[in-house]
């Protein structure tokens, strides 16, 4: 199986456990990119929509491209009632967008699965002049200051966490966007908290 499609085999679990994004992030993104009715937005690989509804709620013309058929179907079930929602089940790398152009293209932990040169050049070419590329990423690498506890947790991971499919990701350097015509590259961080039950 192609690794890029692994989450398509477990859409319900992906939807349940995938981290959500900060409300402040979306408020600032919508303001920065001036997203509102009449603006055209493309989301790359929305999965099950963890970063979709806040953008849909702006009234913009929302368009998504999702590689996974099961994930695309879930997106249609969740957001098909929105008049401004549209999604295509296709591979961004080879998809022909025709004369479509966008005011913002965004990716919530997806763009890094696309070869860097294709990701940056194709998104740049699809943007209207002055358009925005937003790349969202979640990181769950908080390290407790309790070193003894941290080391014990790592021992448990080493002993029991053996995924069926090894996690492989090519090198993707977000700041390299400036090598493809992008300007005003900046990084912002938003912190949150996730809680799980012992069963989870």
Where are these regions (language model features)?
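A short, conserved alpha-helix within the catalytic core of class I
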Residues: 113-123
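Conserved class I S-adenosyl-L-methionine
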Residues: 1-36
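Conserved catalytic/acceptor-binding region of the Class I
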Residues: 124, 129-194
């Amino acid at each position: 199986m192609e690794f890029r499609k692994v989450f398509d085999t477990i859409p319900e679990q992906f939807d349940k456990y995938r981290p959500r994004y900060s409300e402040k992030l979306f408020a600032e993104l919508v303001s920065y990119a001036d997203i509102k009715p009449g603006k055209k937005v493309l989301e790359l690989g929305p999965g099950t929509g963890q970063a979709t509804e806040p953008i849909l709620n702006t009234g913009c013309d929302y368009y998504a491209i999702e590689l996974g058929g099961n994930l695309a179907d879930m997106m249609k079930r969740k957001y098909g009632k929105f008049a401004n929602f549209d999604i295509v089940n296709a591979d961004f790398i080879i998809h022909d967008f025709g004369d479509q152009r966008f005011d913002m293209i965004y990716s919530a932990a997806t763009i890094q699965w696309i070869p860097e040169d294709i990701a940056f050049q194709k998104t740049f070419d699809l943007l209207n002049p002055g358009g925005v590329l937003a790349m969202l990423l979640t990181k769950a690498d908080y390290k407790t200051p309790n070193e003894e506890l941290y080391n014990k947790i790592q021992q448990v991971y080493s002993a029991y966490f053996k995924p069926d499919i090894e996690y492989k990701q090519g090198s993707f350097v977000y700041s390299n966007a400036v090598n493809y015509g992008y300007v005003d590259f900046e990084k912002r961080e938003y912190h949150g908290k996730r809680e799980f039950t012992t069963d989870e």
